Amino acid sequence: VYHIYNRGINGENIFREERNYHYFLSLYAKYVFPVADTFAYCLLKNHFHFLVRIKDVHEFIPDRVQNTVRDKNYVSRKFSHMFNSYAQSINTAFNRTGGLFETPFKRKKVTAEAYFTAMIGYIHLNPVKHKFVKSPEEYIWSSYHSFLSNRPTKLNRD
C-alpha cells in the first residue's frame, strides 16, 4: 500500500475549475484503476493524495498484461501517463507551458495497519486542515462520502 501525493509546481493550483477535478478523476479511472485498488483520495486545488494498493499482475484489468510481466516500470508509467495527460490539458486550456506538478510524484510505503488507518483519516481531513471546509462531509472532491456509503463504488472499502 502506498500514499501517493503531489502538488502544483511552486504551489500553483492544479485544479482551477470544477471540470478539472472531473477530468483528473476520469484519467485516474482510465490509467490507475486497472492497476491499483484505491482506498482513499482527496483533490485540493493545489495538491492531491491517494492511498492505493498496487494489484498483482494477474489482477490487472486486461491491458497488454503479457507485456507487464517483463516491464517493472509499467505501473509507474500508468501514473506518469495520467499526470502528463492532465498537465497537457491544463496547459492547453489555460494557455500555459511547462510542468504543472512537482516531479516526480511522491510515494510513501504504508506497511503498518495503524499507519494505514491514520492515512485514511489524514487524507479525508486534508480539506479541513487547509481550511477549505469545517468538516470532511462538506468537501466533495474526496472519497469521504464513498468511504462511508454502502453504495457500489470503485473505492476499495475492505
Task: Describe each region flagged by the PLM.
Residues 1-45, 53-158:
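Short Pro-Cys-Gly-centered "Cys-loop" motif that presents a nucleophilic cysteine in a tight turn
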